[in-house]
């Protein structure tokens, strides 16, 4: 199974992670309940969680503080493990158990790409990096999000997977439009 959108999301977010300095780890992010270090931990830990779920293994009981170490190297390792797990025979058709429910591997692949990419956008915004990330991938993920995300999945930060849709500014790039659709103020 091709994991190309997910791998593009990994590459885009990795570029953002390399631009984060230690002095930025306490900065606020578009995810109001998280600072940069929290979001780094989520993005890096998410890669390991995708891998564990695809291997039918429970997630780690105690999440490491990736932001306190070489989080780019940890991201690379977790992403490589997740990509390999997504490429296993039959995984796209298998039901995968996650901490928040069950879904087919093919849907988890889309979720992994979107989560990884959008949180890369969040980190770019929080650390003053450009947010017009991977325009073609962002357009593809936005199209999928418009089909998959419904109002019942939206609510206040921390209470629902996505915030209320925001209006993107006139002429906003695809990544900014995706972020706004998923509830970020652009």
Regions found by a protein language model. Give the residues of each.
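Extended, alpha-helix-rich binding/interface surfaces that flank or overlap catalytic cores
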Residues: 39
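Structured surface interface patches that mediate subunit assembly and partner/cofactor docking
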Residues: 1-15, 19-32, 49-186
